[in-house]
Amino acid sequence: MDFYKNISLIIIALMISTDIIAQEEDSNEYIEEVVTATARETTVLDVPYNISTLSGDEITNRAILDNGELLRNFVGISTIDRGYRNAGTTNNIRIRGLNVDSSALQDYPVSAVASVSTYVDKTPIFANFLLRDLKRVEVLRGPQGTLYGSGALGGTIRYITNDPMLGVSEGSVLYTTTAVNGSESVGNAVDVVYNMPLEDKVAYRLVASYLDYPGVTDYVNVFRTGNLPDVGAGPSYGVPIPSDGVGYPDFYTSPPAIYTAEDADTVEIAFMRHKFLFDITNNLDLVFSAAMQDDDVGGRRQASTGTRYVLNDDCVSLFAAGCYSESTYGEYENGALMLEPSSRDVSMYSLELTYDGNGYTAILSQSSHEKTGNNTTDNTGYFAGLGTFTSPIAGYFNDFFGVGGIFGTPARPYAVAERQYTNEADTTEFKIVSDIGEKFDFVVGTFMQEEDQHRAQQTYIKGSNMWNYYYWGVDYVVDANEQDFDYMVSESITNSATYGELTYHSSENFDVTFGWRRFSVEADANMNMSFKLYDVGPATDESSNKDSGTLKKVKDRKSVV
């Protein structure tokens, strides 16, 4: 990350000069948009389904900064924009309203395949890479199952990056500063693009970006935490600190130490892409690409609603009258009791070998990617809403003897959820694409992907050990870390397919496309779950599933002249 922080020094070191070329364009001239949605270069008007594009130059000129803003430029697409914290975790893109998972599933990746597939060049991956040095973005609306397979029920979004250019040495540096409502800080972003020839038939293209955006959300109820000494129940870690100490009865009655974390949802992203082009022969090219991105986000970009309970400065006991006063949350205020940071690392490597034959093009694509991430979520409100803290079943802060008073309600409930996930996949695809013929043209191919996913969660009920020690008068420790819930699931998924499309040009203005995709999916999963605070578990389970079938498509296109 330090390398990217110092990337601004490159601006001074390189002193890249930029030639500004003014070009006069006839505003009445129609410019055909070339796309590759059908695996061959063709115009938008010749594609037999609904497609929209946005060029990389348009993305830059419109100062589009993120994927949520990009998709708002296309008709018929919606996405839930909760900021960078959740942007790379779950694919919630919807085309024509079609969705698979609940909109509430944002903090955690899920097993289900999304309804809209995303590709970076020819690699199927949902990565939320920065929108840097793109040639164009293609949005294909409607089912794309025959060519793009699983996850393309609603459509497909393709991010096409710029290839290296042979014999060209040029570069650019772009510095962007931003200001947002709700924050007094200024955001900064630096982008470097450099294209250089290595030999007559080899070229290299570098894209490096670093952005540091300020937050706008104020966490106004953050508990100060620390470690509790061993008074008989063992030491406890990361527990909300009572203002008046941890003795009895202060541990029960003392108000928490609260502070406000202003502009907590900061965003820091470092991105780099290397791309090599090898012009092996006149009709054989090899492109190697490697892209990496690291995200660090300070908190959730979400404002709280409802009543805000403000701890008064003169409060000495949580059970005294007037300890709290009621207020309302401001426009950019969040009431979580803890900061909710997240981090994510994603890397992608791909090889694309293209052979331009006599009347056809053969393309072999090999790619791999890896995504890892973790985040913290405040589960306190969720537990409180269910009545879990004082439930006789859960037993965290249960007044078993019905004493009431200071034992009736936990003083400083604090439930932390720590989540981690990884996703790895290797993908191979080979296809033959015919040139556009007078009567017929076709695409045939094979696809294979092996994917491994891992997800885990640990939930902690902080302060429960000491609370129960004082209540019961004995060592009540079941788990030294006060961990309530431990969950882990691992999955291995193999997806293979053969597919094809045949287009018949019955006339100059009418085409019919027939498509099919024969697929096979195998999925193995194992789960491990335990409730450590009750000393229950682990419970384990394994499952295996297989599915296969054939997708079929018939699509007509009529040109109106």
Place the predicted regions along the sequence by residue:
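Conserved small/polar residues in nucleotide/adenosyl-binding loops
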Residues: 558-561
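Membrane-proximal, glycine/serine-rich, low-complexity loop/turn segments characteristic
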Residues: 25-27, 31, 52, 123, ...
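Acidic, small-polar-rich N-terminal luminal/periplasmic segments of exported/outer-membrane proteins
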Residues: 28-166
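Solvent-exposed loop segments that connect transmembrane elements
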Residues: 216-262, 300-337, 378-418, 458-488, ...
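Cleavable N-terminal targeting peptides that direct proteins into the secretory/outer-membrane pathway or into
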Residues: 1-25
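Face-selective signature of the C-terminal outer-membrane beta-barrel domain
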Residues: 344-372, 412-534, 547-555
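Outer-membrane beta-barrel proteins
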Residues: 83, 145, 161, 178-182, ...
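Transmembrane beta-barrel wall of Gram-negative outer-membrane proteins
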Residues: 182-298, 422-428, 432-449, 494-503, ...
